[in-house]
Amino acid sequence: FPLLAIPFFMLAGNLMSSGGIAKRLVNFFDSLIGHVTGGLGMVTIIVCMFFAAISGSAVATVSAVGAFMIPEMVSHGYNKPFSAALTAAAGTIGVIIPPSIPFVIYGVVSGTSITDLFTAGFLPGIMMGIALMVVCYFVSKKNGYRGKEKASTPAEIWKTFKDAFWAILSPVIILGGIYSGFFTPTEAAVISVVYSFIIGVFVYKELDIKGAYQSFKDAIVVNGATTFMVGFSTVFAAFLTMAQIPNMIAQGILGLTGNAILILLIINIFLLIVGMFVDNIPATIILTPILLPICTGIGMHPVTFGIMLTMNLAIGFCSPPYGINLFVASSISKVSIEELTRKILKPLLALIVVLLLITYIPAFTMIFLNK
């Protein structure tokens, strides 16, 4: 039953992208901070954070926000490779800020409460956004990427807020309902689809039959591939368990050192490397039974491990050679992967700093949980 959330969150993200929600979020946040140094880059990051709270997908976030913001940043003098790299990095927040498709997968595999994972992922997602905004500010200051000539007036801010109100309300309804216990994450995914459809068709009036058809089609195609990955990965994970591979790997890691700090560092490095080559869904299904017992054995809570695992694999989305966010941003911006790779290094380092904070300071993930 929890896996049913995946296709519905995918569909909701597609409907919102086609329904003009991303554009209105951009206009609102641009009116707030578009005038500061690096303002457009920061707007891109914040909109990615909001869109993440709607779609639960990194690729959907990069596609929806990047198509609008990369050309906008370039038109205001931003370096195109940097604009694309920043968007690719910000897209990783899509699987950390709830709702999150990888959290659903991890919750099913590990038996961890999906609602707890959604609650715990909120603060780390915000931390990732802040870290990227700090990078954006200093890079913009160094290269002269200035904001708008003048700040928006209160009347202009109010106008963009009214236009974006229903878009802003969407994550409030979805996450508020989950956190309050009013509905489950799976039910929230269905409500998200209904809400997106109503807003796109009847409020913003930008979602037509063609757009709705394409949204359903894209969701079906992506979910089909996802379902196959889940099926085959589950079988492979069961085979590894029967062959006692998890026990062998655990003994190998624990044989290297008994120091909890070093064990977590080794696991993080391993997961970062895996994330560069393997999609997050099969990686989560295969590696959770192997690594979770090791981490819980040294005192880490399963929720914290789930955030750490997902964040590692998310960073892989924008890491060469096979980071999917890089390819999406490259396709949108027409910038080569080689150019993107050079510009992604600083955002990647910022995300890794947040990862280490999450790993070694459990309060960042457990602060909103009464556990």
Regions found by a protein language model. Name each.
Residues 1-371:
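Alpha-helical transmembrane segments of multi-pass membrane transport proteins
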